[in-house]
Amino acid sequence: MAQVTFEEISASDFFYRNRDIAGFTNPTRAIFAAIRELVENSLDAAESIKTPPDIYVRLSFEGEASEETQIYKLRVEDNGCGIPPRHIPSAFGQVLYGSKYKLKQQRGTFGLGGKMAILYGQITTHQPATIISSTSPSSKIFMYKLMIDIQRNRPIILDRKVLLNKEGWRGTVVEFSLEGDYLRAMPKILEYFKQTAMVNPYANITFVDPKGRLYKFVRATTVMPDPPKETLPHPYGVDVELLQRLIQVTPYNSILEFLKNHFHRVGEITAKKFLEFSGVSPSKNPKKLSHEEVVRLVQMLKRFKDFLPPDASCLSPLGEELLKTGVLKELKPEFVAVHQRKPATYAGHPFIVEVAIAYGGEIPQRGGFIIYRFANRIPLLYDEASDVSVKVINAMNWRRYKVSPDMPIAIVVHICSTKVPYKTVGKEFIADRPEVRREIANGLREVARQLQRYLTRREHVDRERKRLGVFSKYLPRIAEFSTKLAGKEKPPDIEKLLRSVKRFGFEGV
């Protein structure tokens, strides 16, 4: 019988062996994923200090890796909050270490993407990453050169320097080499920047590609959405593991105080009602609950119907005005309608759906709707057919709104949540949750009705323009003939008559 060997592997070793699940499936996807993850970290860093983001991305050619792939150096620089020097090595050299594990709306979810980009670069080029950061214009600049110890999931610090901050800079620079196929990735990368600019209209984004071509996406406003707030878990979203963790760290000695202080929107009255419902004494010490009692408590939390729904104040939707600004800036349509749904919940997690529909202008006709999908202001560019938004759009009866897929129409769907229901670690598409599907459908119906009203008005205007054109063409001739027939010298003033048949304003709809 063959001997079976058991071994433990680190988190970085796991993702080294299974990098596909984080979106680094091939050189084309990998270079796109690396840029995306670092840009999103930069956006989060700037927004956390309420500063309109200024992000600079440069991709430089370094050499050929094979017949189909090349080595590039990627540099991403931002004006965000910076990283305290003691955290820099672990923040970039330890997989699943970071600031993304609190319950609030943010682009990052797993504390994984930025480290995966550096890990991928290290695997494919065997070169270290350089991290430069400053947390304040008055503080010093810290520079680290590091690699990841894959087997131990620890940073290897190769060099550390402390520099004077003469220009009063604050932010972070990440620079490393990686293998990729930019020529194949270029359309997705440029589309990513365009869509990021659309849903973050307050950001300046500059991209320099390997051929030195400069792409600038200039902010259209300095107005930013309110930053998201950290929140407590809602009782409906709690499982046994989370409840046990809360019990381990709680300073409270009664289950009543524990419920009031560790759960979202649970006050004393609600907590007492729940404890009566579940048959637990309010004075019982939560640390003395047995495993079976913890399991039963979770089951009762799910069954209790009187918990208040999650409060969406912890969320940071883009808002109708900013969404409209972004769509107008990037798509330049003839007409745009936007709608923000009221907060809703799934599995105890609050979420808000924002939708927009744009028509005409510079939107091309492609024989189908152009669909833009976003989650927490992240563009979702891959696996479109699997996304719940696309399923809802395809299932709608657009004919009732006088809309057909061959019209120049773009549809935007944005979902923000403390926990976006992604189907994969790579954050490529959103799962088909009934609550999310319902909110998307209701939002789309609202903007479709607005578009229908616009198209109806435009039909009336076109009809009246044609009618007025006929009058304008023939009335002068009729007036001239009538003048001669009546033996008059001066023809009547037909402008008054033309104004009387002008029923609509034709300067716009």
Model-inferred region functions:
Residues A22-F24, S99-L103, P282-K284, V420-G426:
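Short small-residue beta-strand/loop micro-motif enriched in glycine and branched aliphatics
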Residues A2, Y72-K73, G98-R245, S283-M300, ...:
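GHKL-type ATPase core
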Residues S281, K287-G360:
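C-terminal extensions
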Residues P251, L256-S278:
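Helix-hairpin-helix
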Residues M1-W169, V173-S177, L259, V266-E268:
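GHKL (Bergerat-fold) ATPase N-terminal catalytic module, capturing the glycine-rich phosphate-binding loop
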Residues K50-R58, F207, D311-C314, Y454-D462:
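Short, glycine/acidic-rich hinge or "gate" loops at secondary-structure transitions
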